Amino acid sequence: MPLPDFHVSEPFTLGIELEMQVVNPPGYDLSQDSSMLIDAVKNQITAGEVKHDITESMLELATDVCRDINQAAGQFSAMQKVVLQAAADHHLEICGGGTHPFQKWQRQEVCDNERYQRTLENFGYLIQQATVFGQHVHVGCASGDDAIYLLHGLSRFVPHFIALSAASPYMQGTDTRFASSRPNIFSAFPDNGPMPWVSNWQQFEALFRCLSYTTMIDSIKDLHWDIRPSPHFGTVEVRVMDTPLTLSHAVNMAGLIQATAHWLLTERPFKHQEKDYLLYKFNRFQACRYGLEGVITDPHTGDRRSLTEATLRLLEKIAPSAHKIGASSAIEALHRQVVSGLNEAQLMRDFVADGGSLIGLVKKHCEIWAGE
């Protein structure tokens, strides 16, 4: 399929996707009933969309195009209410978190969808292993060239986004010692990590054409990059965050990305170059492994800085942009989180350290999601 022309979007408009866990009480393992749940709610959703993801234990909530985080929060809240009622009617529960702490990938059923079945054919068991749960944020751009500039700018802050959203310390019944283990699942995919270097939209079109020769890439949706342009929507899509345990944190993360995008495209503070990515995977690893306690290194100067310090600097830089787009509350909440030194991964570990079981942890996550 040829790459579509870049759709002109209103700059800094917002779209958010949340991949949620569908679980079966009282054992709280992943359910395989998302299709039943989607059928139950599809005629009750008036704004946004509830839809499938890769496997039958995943449920995606997606907003429409939103002006700001307040509009997005309203749409999510309405969808949450409908989904929770339908889940209760079918004796299911819903929760966030980047991984389910004890599910077995061998049990996961890929959705009966042409695209997902084709992906299963291409990638085999890797697709079942990809039963992990992330938050994706789209930001509108006025042109393809703006999208490429924004993508490179946001890529500088991938470690910050990962550290702030880290919520996947457990996988397959094991403490992984990572704050965010979810991104590791995609390391075996040939398109894992950052997008290959291009400097403008014309070069991106040539890159996509080359990738399509592999026969594994039919559309932009087949690419698993950390950040990718979405020409059909006219957006840049950030894909590195774990799904948070609460809607409020999800909205705050979206506000952070929207405000960062506003600052980047308004101020144009960087002259991007390929060398910017020299230490990308090392810095990304630090965020996944240690969260805000990780240390990132500047590829140009060799300077090292904790992610706590680097994130506080970012929040300070983007505060004026956040004020202009109505996202100040998100930046203030994230500032409090950084100062506290806590993320959701650490809260999960604290629960288990206090004697809680992994079954009890999922139950608690369902209570958090339902109680907000």
From Swiss-Prot:
Q: Which domain of life is it from?
A: Bacteria
Enzyme class, one word? ligase
This enzyme catalyses: L-cysteine + L-glutamate + ATP = gamma-L-glutamyl-L-cysteine + ADP + phosphate + H(+)
- Disulfide links within the chain: none
Q: Which Gene3D superfamilies match?
A: 3.30.590.20
Pfam families registered for this protein in UniProt: GCS2
* EC number of the protein: 6.3.2.2
Q: Where is the signal peptide?
A: none
> Any keyword Ligase?
yes
The GO terms describing molecular function are:
ATP binding; glutamate-cysteine ligase activity
| UniProt keyword annotations, A-Z | ATP-binding, Ligase, Nucleotide-binding
| One GO BP annotation of this record | modified amino acid biosynthetic process
Keyword rRNA processing recorded:
no
Q: What does this protein do?
A: ATP-dependent carboxylate-amine ligase which exhibits weak glutamate--cysteine ligase activity.
Q: What quaternary arrangement does the UniProt entry report? A: Homodimer.
Under the heading PANTHER family, the entry gives: GLUTAMATE--CYSTEINE LIGASE 2-RELATED
User: What does the similarity note say?
Assistant: Belongs to the glutamate--cysteine ligase type 2 family. YbdK subfamily.
Output this protein's name: Putative glutamate--cysteine ligase 2
- Recorded source organism is Escherichia coli O1:K1 / APEC
The UniProt gene name for this protein comes to ybdK
